[in-house]
Regions:
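Non-heme di-metal
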Residues: 1-202
Length: 202
């Protein structure tokens, strides 16, 4: 991030532009900037809440776009995707202000820890869904639990091999989210979906 010394505009991009987009000041007036002094404040709580809300809006609009495409509303689908992109930008900006993006090694470590935590959270969700006779919800939670454990293994593997980064192709099951590294499975080991349900990630 950077801040204009003239007009105090804050830019959220990594790279400084040649001029401030608000007042036109030259690049030498655009100085590095970090948000500080927000620990324990409502601003910090609002940034966290904003990140969650924008992330949810991003994903919700992608789901709405998918449904619009199924119903042959191509223009509406494009609108939902465009707004999803904007909401994703908002979420990313909030996360950066929360110092939630570090170097790649730290990001992998944080992602590994979050996946481990998530896989430990799901057993309680599954138990409660079963107790309330919500079998389909329990199944989705079971898929998520099993897939999160796999994600943690992939992050750990990446952490161990960062120095000698291999060119690996990933395949994601569009039913349960299972990620296969290196080869396309004949069927998903978590939900049993056929290989046609996998998408390659470049």
């Amino acid at each position: 991030m950077w801040k204009c010394a003239n007009c105090h505009h804050v830019g959220l991009t990594e790279d400084r532009p040649f001029h401030c987009p608000v007042c036109g000041a030259d690049a030498d007036k655009l100085v590095p900037h970090q948000v500080s002094g927000i620990k324990g404040t409502k601003t910090l709580q609002n940034l966290k809440a904003g990140f969650v809300a924008e992330s949810q809006a991003h994903q919700r609009n992608l789901a709405f776009a998918f449904k619009a495409e199924q119903e042959d509303y191509a223009q509406v689908a494009r609108l939902f995707r465009a707004i999803a992109e904007a909401e994703g930008i908002h979420a990313f900006n909030h996360l950066r202000l929360l110092s939630g993006v570090s170097d790649t090694h730290e990001n992998l470590q944080a992602a590994f820890e979050r996946e481990n935590l998530a896989s430990k959270t799901y057993p309680q969700f599954i138990k409660e869904a079963n107790e309330e006779d919500n079998v389909s919800v329990a199944r989705i939670f079971s898929y998520s639990r099993d897939v999160e454990a796999g994600h943690a293994k992939l992050y750990k593997k990446a952490l161990e091999h960062m120095v000698q980064e291999a060119d690996t192709k990933y395949y994601v099951c569009s039913v349960c989210g299972y990620v296969s590294d290196g080869e396309l499975p004949e069927q998903c080991p978590i939900c049993g979906a056929p290989k046609e349900k996998f998408r390659g990630i470049d």
